[in-house]
Amino acid sequence: MEKRPQKTLARTLGCSTACCQFVFVLALFAPAILAFHHSTSDTEVSKITDILTAVEVAETPRPDGLVKIFSVVKSHRPDISDGEAWRVSEVILEESAKRHLDPMMVLAVIRVESGFQYTTVSPMGARGIMQIMPETGRFLTETLSGEYGFHPASFRPESLDDPLLNIRLGVYYLHGLTKQFRSLNLALLAYNAGPGEIQNRLENNIAFSEEYATLVLDAYQSFKKSKPPTF
């Protein structure tokens, strides 16, 4: 009989062990998974999703950058499930990379804008985790409809309460402002006050407060210095 190379054998045994662990975890939660077929309530669907996410996390190592984002999200929102926090963290990482922004900067904007609350509404009407004005949200949804398959006709102000949608729109918007003003400070001020207001002040040499930009940059430095936890 042909002797299998030792490294190949070890790899095969390792895969078999991982598969056995995966099957074992699924077996433990089989009753909950089967219950999905008898009820479609949001709570039970969320529980099933979190179970499957937990299994995936156990089997798949997470990059340090994602783990660091997750730790920031959970430190501000200990009330949400790990599965939900991972999903939010993944979107922050993906969108930041796509728009060439530091995810720690995106987290800093979220911290100052909403404190990571999904349904916050400002006195001016800005909504969601990145505090987007409804008219801006509608415009961004139309702009990105081809890229993400958004349906602008179904957009409502309440749509911005979806944190994943809000993050996608907010990161794209911040990216556009950095290109327009060619300055992170000015882009942050425009994110807060509106690009028209900042442009008008620049053209007419009108002073403006940089307090908002300072708050965001302070949060950014704090997040930047923090180390990702080890799980």
Give residue ranges: language-model regions.
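Iron-associated oxidoreductase/ferritin-like identity signal
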Residues: 14, 35-38, 231
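Catalytic glycan-binding domains that act on GlcNAc-containing polysaccharides
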Residues: 52-231
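Short N-terminal segments immediately surrounding and downstream of signal-peptide cleavage
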Residues: 37-57
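N-terminal Sec-pathway targeting helices
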Residues: 4-25
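Bacterial Sec-dependent signal peptides at the C-terminal "C-region" and cleavage site
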Residues: 19-20, 24-44
